[in-house]
Structure formats: C-alpha cells, structure tokens
C-alpha cells in the first residue's frame, strides 16, 4: 500500500512539473510571452526612454521660460533618446506617442504623423493619439482628416473629443 502511495505522489509530481514547464519557453519567459509585456525596463534609470522623457520635460521647462535655444537642444536630445528606445521596442504605444509629440514640437509634422499613425496601427481607438493626430491634420490644413479623427472620438464622451472639437470649431 505504501508503494502505491509513493508511486502516486511521484507520478503526480512528474505530471505537475511537466505541465508547469509546458508554459515556459527556452528562456523561461512563458510560451505565450513575446517578451514585451513587461515594459518595466523602460523605467530603468539609464533607459533611453527615460532619458528621452527627462530631456522632453526639460525642453518644455526651457520653452516656458522663453529659453528657446536650450529648449531646442533638449528636444534634439529627446529625439535621439526616443529613436534609440524605438530601435529596442518599436511597438511601444507610449514611446510612439512621445515620438509623435517631439517631432511635432520641432516642426517635423511628417515624422510626427508617421509615428502617430504607427501608434494607431497598434491601438486604432486610442483617444489621445487620435486627438493629437486630429490636431496635426487641422494645423496642416487637412480639415477633412481632422474631422475624421473627431468622428472616431465622438463616441468616447472624453476630454480628447472636446479638445479636438474646440480646435476644429475655432473656439
């Protein structure tokens, strides 16, 4: 009877261990994992993403203080860091949003539009990115495209809709 008990425990342990390993790939990340779900590395002290975000914050502070040359230098640094981070994680929605914003701030609306559209490929219903792209379209005299973005936001009952509507209506 004891042998049967130990044999049952041994078989149960073996089956449980194999089922647990079935969910792990060769790197022990998880079979369904793409490795991108955990984006905590973006917040690491020396990550390009964090450096870019810090440079952008500094650029905005300098711009508000009317120190435009310093602001411009910080924006260039932010672009450099964000592009480096983009090479590491090209499908990060927050990063694509920052790239669109920074390029818009330096006046490169073509690159800004590219990154905003790339973000919308990942999340077509993202309210903030639809709003920002709508603003870009409006400011580049493409009102019909701006109104399309407004239409996408019309069902969200959100601040982004209100902001874009005020911009388009000129209020």
Protein language model features and the residues they cover:
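TPR/TPR-like (Sel1-like) alpha-helical repeat modules
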Residues: 121, 131-160
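Helix-start (N-cap) detector for alpha-helical repeat units in TPR-like alpha-solenoids
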Residues: 45, 93-94, 127-128, 160-162
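Canonical tetratricopeptide repeat
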Residues: 98, 132, 164-167
